[in-house]
């Protein structure tokens, strides 16, 4: 089955430890979740550099903006090297790509090389943003998502679980948005991403999931609908379609009872009692499900039940 591409944006601020530039426990937690996510998706990672370099320091010492931005780009390379080392230690293959030439450290950001790496089930770690000053890492994420045809951008935030109309840590009455269009976010000036990045995502029909990064299983919980998050896209119906993701089908199947009409078949029971390759069943079933209307959740679940039931009964006989 052809895997969809997900680009995960991790802010530098979320990486920072109390006394060190990187919280190693948090980095290990990220690596573990990336490994799980890569079983079902192609994964590219973009790391910020805010744990190492902040723009306010540049202002205090009178540094020119372009030099400050270049330091920020180099900080993303340092974080990328740390993440790559951790992934290697847990047997996850990865490659670092840089939009600035540094051949002894990273591969050049060339689309065909990136696509080859992703197709070989490697994690692509993207560093240096767009490679140009005056552009944020958010814009770099959006450009990469558009160039590579990503389905989702996962925008991990520090200490906030989605998009609000004001800072929820300061305003207990802040309004939370479960779904938001890029147009509305730009109009209201909400801090989802910068205007350039939002415009690129809007034009390229890329969906963005904004979630709380610094909590256990933050990435997986957001992608499996087990935690609070905001989905940003141009169609509100995307929220229903997202709720019926592939991983969600599998999770629901493992938890439900064996009732063909109303519930999804209990996969664990079948797997224990028979020698069927359940993973193959799901792969074939999901390909058929993707041909159906994504917004008709109940119909899709019923169809999945019928496919698995038929396969199960044929093999049991």
From Swiss-Prot:
Inhibited by UTP. Its EC number is 2.7.4.22. UMP binds at residues 49, 69, 130-137. Pathway: Pyrimidine metabolism; CTP biosynthesis via de novo pathway; UDP from UMP (UMPK route): step 1/1. Its main location: cytoplasm. Disulfide bonds: none annotated. The keyword Transport does not apply. InterPro entries: AceGlu_kinase-like_sf, Asp/Glu/Uridylate_kinase, Uridylate_kinase_bac. It holds the Pfam family AA_kinase. Keywords: ATP-binding, Cytoplasm, Kinase, Nucleotide-binding, Pyrimidine biosynthesis, Transferase. GO terms for cellular component: cytoplasm. Homohexamer. PANTHER family: URIDYLATE KINASE, URIDYLATE KINASE PUMPKIN, CHLOROPLASTIC. Belongs to the UMP kinase family. Catalyzes the reversible phosphorylation of UMP to UDP. This is Uridylate kinase. It comes from Malacoplasma penetrans (strain HF-2). The lineage of its organism: Bacteria, Bacillati, Mycoplasmatota, Mycoplasmoidales, Mycoplasmoidaceae.
